């Protein structure tokens, strides 16, 4: 009797062990299936993420799209693409070419020192002023403020030549011109804030809409191309009769340089 009980107990133990092993094997299979499925989901997510990043990388940027958008030329411009901006009296015999980038600190220093004298000379008919806008600092310092400010200048030029000159002076003013590495001009609301210091632009709904809608973004890109084709490599640059004028830092030095160029 004792021997039979012992054999029965052993059989029961073996059956219990077998059942336990089957349960464990089943758990292991389920675990492996979960791991494989999870790895598959992760792989799909990674592949999908990579595909999305590749697609995004190949998508044109906002300004690349703007370069192919409809061209709207501001008033007070000439030329097929509206990038010839000449201000002043028609009977002025010579034209001063001024190359500037809105983010350029040296341009700001020049405008703060000499800008008012330039405006007086143009108003007096001493010479005409041709403006050529650049955007290369956006590439060098990263950002889009040069392009955005140039577009806003187009909106100001559409109002009037005087509004354009006053707005340009405000953009370069000591109070409102940011550091070269600070891309404040990339923000429409900042450009409108600057415009609020210009009587002809303050509260001007057409100007505001032109800035916010990017009406002159394509024009800004065309103007930038015009600068790139000019051969000028830095700003500010002044030219008269195709000859470069050393950039003066005071009104008196500017007048001396201009008078010499006018006689040349």
Task: Describe each model-derived feature in a short phrase.
Residues 57-123, 133:
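Extracytoplasmic low-complexity, Pro/Thr/Ser/Ala/Gly-rich segments
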Residues 77, 172-185, 211-218, 253-258:
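Short secondary-structure transition/capping segments
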Residues 93-95, 125-128, 162-165, 202-203, ...:
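Loop/turn elements at helix/coil->beta-strand transitions in domains of secreted/extracellular proteins
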Residues 102, 108-184, 188:
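Structural alpha/beta surface segment adjacent to cysteine/selenocysteine redox centers
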Residues 40-48:
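Core hydrophobic alpha-helical transmembrane segments of single-pass membrane proteins
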Residues 2-36, 49-60, 194-264:
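C-terminal cap of thioredoxin/glutaredoxin-like
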Residues 90, 123-124, 159, 230-233:
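Extracellular/periplasmic catalytic domains that process cell-envelope and extracellular macromolecules
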């Amino acid at each position: 009797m004792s021997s039979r009980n012992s054999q029965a107990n052993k059989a029961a133990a073996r059956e219990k062990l077998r059942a336990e092993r089957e349960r464990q094997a089943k758990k292991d299979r389920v675990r492996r299936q979960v791991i494989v499925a999870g790895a598959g989901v992760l792989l799909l997510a990674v592949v999908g993420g990579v595909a999305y990043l590749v697609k995004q990388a190949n998508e044109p940027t906002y300004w690349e799209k703007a370069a192919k958008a409809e061209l709207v030329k501001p008033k007070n411009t000439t030329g097929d693409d509206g990038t010839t901006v000449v201000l002043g009296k028609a009977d002025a015999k010579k034209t001063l070419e001024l190359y500037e980038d809105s983010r350029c600190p040296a341009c700001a220093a020049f405008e703060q020192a000499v800008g008012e004298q330039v405006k007086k000379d143009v108003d007096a008919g001493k010479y005409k002023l041709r403006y050529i806008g650049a955007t290369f600092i956006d590439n060098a310092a990263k950002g889009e403020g040069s392009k955005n400010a140039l577009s806003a200048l187009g909106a100001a030029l559409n109002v009037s030549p005087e509004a354009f000159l006053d707005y340009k002076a405000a953009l370069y003013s000591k109070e409102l011109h940011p550091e070269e590495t600070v891309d404040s001009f990339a923000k429409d609301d900042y450009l409108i804030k600057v415009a609020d210091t210009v009587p002809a632009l303050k509260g001007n709904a057409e100007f505001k809409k032109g800035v916010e809608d990017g009406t002159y973004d394509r024009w800004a890109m065309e103007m930038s191309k015009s600068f790139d084709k000019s051969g000028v490599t830095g700003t500010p640059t002044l030219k008269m009769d195709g000859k470069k004028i050393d950039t003066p830092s005071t009104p008196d030095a500017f007048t001396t340089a201009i008078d010499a160029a006018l006689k040349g």
